From Swiss-Prot:
Family: Belongs to the SecA family.
Organism: Mycolicibacterium vanbaalenii (strain DSM 7251 / JCM 13017 / BCRC 16820 / KCTC 9966 / NRRL B-24157 / PYR-1) (Mycobacterium vanbaalenii)
EC class: translocase
Protein's UniProt name: Protein translocase subunit SecA 1
Enzyme Commission number(s) of this protein: 7.4.2.8
Length: 938
């Protein structure tokens, strides 16, 4: 029945979900009679039933949901509504549950999380920021812990051991940033015990549209220092001023692209003294040339960037702010530095990357929650195979959505906004003002200060403090100015948010749901009636004033973001109102049909301070938003189309890497690699002609670079050891060389073990294979990026770029694997090996005042001297050191989507942002540059 349910139409799906909720209701009476211990015992009962194999999760779902509903009532004093039961069932079936703001998505997620955690494979609940992950793990975790499940949270400050413990919990909360980078780091680990994740079973993504759609254009990238190419940046910065537009290259200012023509190519070839710029060996030079021309023609000093203290800083096009720590990607920033004759900062090299699309598609089952997914239903289905199920509201929506008001100038618009807010403030109505940037929110704040209107400003930077402001944004006379993305995850409840106010009061008393759970639970139930009474009394006054008024100061390019803002008002059947104030200077109006509207207003001869309300304008705005949404969808599809090629290669490499990491004895794998390499060499030498035509001298010369060859090819031909003298077949040659290589490998193993002890060769094999695979993979990522950059030109030759990219990428991948094998054999035979110094004993020292401090100091000393403290779970590394293999870890840079829709950069260890950028970093920023929207504010 349940499998059929997913194939039904939307209306029938909702009807079936209602059936699930009704069934859960029939179980409630029996569940309510259970004691706390009996309720908790249900978890073990469910697990036993599932382990028996006769029932699956679908079978136990109704009873499990009834148990969770009762536990939530006893612990949180919150009982799931029927619509929340419906939402929980939709999530369990692997859908996106579209639940309007205020309908209790967080509480809904407890249902499928508990159910899917029963098999013990782990459930990940993904939030948009760490504050929400921590808050939900604490509050919703109270229900799970009451039922006997382990709950933990992944935070950026955790150590690898703490992360491993968190992932081993039944339910793990975290951000897409932390989960994605843990996956990449696991596939860079040099020891199995350094891996932290344990698989991808089931994920529930909160704000699924934001994470899987808005942030999906920016891949997660880990990068490290690369070899610098500053000389080439300088050389092309010298050439660019000598080249002329329309002679050597074409410039499209609107699309922000440049194209080098034939005369330009010839000019560069003459200047550099090379025959063909487009030869494979010269392919990197094309990128330097393009960036030099872009830096010259498309980026103006003091407009797009400024130079201060010998550094180039990007300027935000919308806010005019200097973006400290942000750099253009793909070598463009270095080209601008060369143009301005300042120090050229090193470019970073990508060492690992994955798109959010491909990360989340690894989960066996994926589900999501949001208040606004209907406009993106097609994309969610096409890319993630997720259906969108609109869940009915618990109470009818009575919010009034007023028509947009359009003003001719931005100044007139903001004057009208302030007047409207002042009028609402006088009667005590709470107002939430949505802006599109920090600069605009601060501008409004200054206007309110001039009018002496008390208010709060939210800029999506300090989530914990902002959650407190949002929790009180529905109180009498509260005026809140917020960027569109600020304060997500906290309900604006008329009169104040009971849960938040109660939690704050308990924390002020020193109580914590994790540190002091029993006292916290007791205090919760004691204080709850008082807080509820206070909030209810104030809510009556707020309702009398008209409820929450949401005022948008600009239309977002996505209808979904506008709907999110509107959805903050009118929750749970409360009264409310919303309106957008627009001007012809707004970004969306400028990009689409702004001139037409301006002509209309001019003909009407209306004063600047008189707005118009016209259906034509509303239609134009909707049309513009639809166009932008489609453009962004196409961009994401294009990213995914090319990344799918890399994804298949990534799977192969990471699977091979995992086998190496997990393999106790790699002798068999090393032997096969040795045979493959010898076979490839022999095939290359014997591919053409008869044996007398083979260049065995060249073959032997190549083999001697790999291992100490112990036989002579003349002896093979002249003796009858492998057949008739003078007659040498390819098979005879191959078998003789394989036998010789095996002899040499056995001798090498004896040599290594004499130096570093028994088992040292196995350790060397693991170290070499991991090191070489990682290095060749990094080089491959670099080459694939170059291929991706230039592949678009294949369209001019009537070829499909994505097909050519897949074909050539496959050839490059096979070549990379062959190179990895060859290099590994060379390292295994030739790397210098010595015994690593044994772990020194920690010198005795006087214990500091605190025993914990003493233990920490001793552990730190041991860590510094041995590279890690040996434990039962993590034994000490063997006594082997290989030159060029066991190098120190390089500082890493992490690049991924930020919550405000831009790109965020972090250094390993939580340091300052990187001063360099990879060629792939901030891919979304590059696209924004091409469409006239430069790198956004962090």
């Amino acid at each position: 029945m349940l499998s059929k349910l997913l194939r039904l139409g939307e209306g029938r799906m909702v009807k079936r979900l209602k059936g699930v909720a009704d069934y859960v209701n029939t179980l409630s009476d029996d569940i309510e009679k259970l004691s706390d211990a009996e309720l908790r015992g249900k978890t073990d009962e469910f697990r036993a039933r599932l382990a028996g194999g006769k029932e699956d999760l679908d079978d136990v779902m109704p009873e499990a949901f009834a148990v969770v509903r009762e536990a939530a009532w006893r612990v949180l004093n919150q009982r799931h509504f029927d619509v929340q039961i419906m939402g929980g069932a939709a999530l369990h079936f692997g859908n996106v549950a579209e639940m309007k703001t205020g309908e209790g998505k967080t509480l809904t997620s407890v249902l499928p999380a508990y159910l899917n955690a029963l098999p013990g494979k782990g459930v990940h609940i993904v939030t948009v920021n760490e504050y929400l992950a921590k808050r939900d793990a604490e509050q919703m975790g109270r229900v799970h812990r009451f039922l006997g499940l382990d709950v933990d949270v992944i935070l950026g400050t955790l150590t690898p051991d703490q992360r491993r413990a968190a992932y081993n919990a039944d339910i793990t909360y975290g951000t897409n940033w932390e989960l994605g980078f843990d996956y990449l780091r696991d596939n860079m680990a040099l020891r199995l015990e350094d891996c932290v994740q344990r698989g991808h079973h089931f994920a529930i993504v909160d704000e699924v549209d934001s994470i899987l759609i808005d942030e999906a254009r920016t891949p997660l990238i880990i990068s490290g220092p690369a070899d610098g190419g500053s000389n080439w940046y300088t050389e092309f910065a010298r050439l660019a001023p000598l080249m002329k537009p329309d002679v050597h290259y074409e410039v499209d200012i609107k699309k922000r692209v440049v194209g080098i023509n034939e005369a330009g190519v010839e000019f560069v070839e003459d200047q550099l003294g090379i025959e063909n710029l487009y030869e494979a060996a010269n392919s990197p030079l094309i990128s330097y040339l393009n960036n030099a021309i872009k830096a010259k023609e498309l980026f103006e000093r003091d407009k797009h960037y400024i130079v201060r203290n010998g550094e180039v800083f990007i300027v935000d096009e919308f806010t005019g702010r200097m973006l400290v720590g942000r750099r253009y990607n793909e070598g463009l920033h270095q080209a601008i530095e060369a143009k301005e004759h300042v120090e050229i900062k090193a470019e970073n090299q990508t060492v690992a990357q994955v798109t959010l699309q491909n990360y989340f598609r690894m989960y066996e089952k994926l589900a999501g929650m949001t208040g606004t997914a209907e406009t993106e239903a097609a994309e969610l289905h096409e890319i993630y195979k997720l259906g969108v199920v609109p869940i009915p509201t618990n109470r009818p929506m009575v919010r009034k959505d007023q028509s947009d008001l359009i003003y001719k100038t931005e100044e007139a618009k903001y004057i009208a906004v302030v007047d409207d807010v002042a009028e609402r403030y006088e009667k005590g109505q709470p107002v939430l003002i949505g802006t599109t940037s920090v600069e605009r929110s601060e501008f409004l704040s200054r206007q309110f200060e001039k009018r002496r209107i008390p208010h709060n400003v939210l800029n999506a930077k300090y989530h914990e403090q902002e959650a407190g402001i949002v929790a009180e944004a529905g109180r009498l006379g509260a005026i809140t100015v917020a960027t569109n993305m600020a304060g997500r995850g906290t309900d604006i409840v008329l009169g104040g948010n009971v849960d938040y106010l109660l939690d704050r009061r308990l924390r002020q008393r020193g109580l914590d749901p994790i540190e002091t759970p029993e006292e916290y639970e007791q205090g919760w139930h004691e204080e709850l009636p008082h807080i509820k009474a206070e909030v209810a009394a104030e809510a009556k006054d707020v309702i009398a004033a008209g409820g929450l008024y949401v005022l948008g100061t600009e239309r977002h390019e996505s209808r979904r973001i506008d709907n999110q803002l509107r959805g903050r008002s009118g929750r749970q059947g409360d009264p409310g109102e919303s309106r957008f104030y627009l001007s012809l200077a707004d970004e969306l109006m400028r990009r689409f049909n702004g001139a037409t509207l301006e002509t209309l207003l001019t003909r009407l001869n209306l004063p600047d301070d008189v707005p118009i309300e016209a259906k034509m304008v509303s239609r134009a705005i909707k049309s513009a938003q639809t166009q932008v949404e489609q453009q962004n969808f196409d961009i994401r599809k294009e990213v995914l189309k090319y990344d799918e090629v890399m994804n298949q290669q990534r799977k192969v490499v990471y699977a091979e890497r995992r086998r190496i990491l997990e393999g106790e004895n790699l002798a068999g794998q090393a032997h096969q690699i040795l045979v493959d390499v010898i076979t490839a060499y022999v095939d290359g030498a014997t591919a053409e002609g008869y044996s007398e035509d083979w260049d065995l001298e060249k073959l032997w010369e190549g083999l001697r670079q790999l291992y100490p060859v112990g036989i002579d090819h003349h002896d093979l031909i002249d003796s009858d050891a492998v057949g008739e003298p003078g007659e040498l077949t390819r098979e005879e040659l191959l078998q003789a060389l394989i036998a010789d290589a095996e002899r040499a490998y056995a001798a090498r193993e004896a040599e290594i073990e004499e130096i570093a002890g028994e088992g040292a060769m196995r350790q060397l094999e693991r170290n070499v294979l991991l090191n070489v695979l990682d290095r060749k993979w990094r080089e491959h990522l670099y080459e694939m990026d170059y291929l991706r950059e230039g592949i678009g030109l294949r369209g001019l030759a009537q070829q499909r770029p994505e097909v050519e990219y897949a074909r050539e990428g496959y050839d490059m991948f096979i070549a990379m694997l062959d190179g990895m094998k060859e290099e590994s054999v060379g390292f295994l035979f030739n790397v210098q090996v010595e015994r690593a110094p044994s772990a020194p004993t920690v010198a005795a020292q006087a214990a500091p005042a605190g025993l914990a401090a003493f233990a920490a100091a001793a552990a730190e000393q041991a860590q510094a001297q041995t590279g890690g403290v040996a434990t039962k779970e993590r034994p000490a590394v063997g006594g082997l050191r290989a030159k060029g293999i066991d190098d120190k870890a390089q500082p890493l840079t992490y690049t991924g989507p930020s919550e405000d829709g831009g790109v965020e950069v972090k250094r390993s260890g939580g340091g300052t942002p990187s001063t360099g950028g990879t060629r792939k970093e901030r891919r979304e920023a590059a696209r924004q540059q091409k469409t006239g929207r430069h790198a956004k504010r962090r």
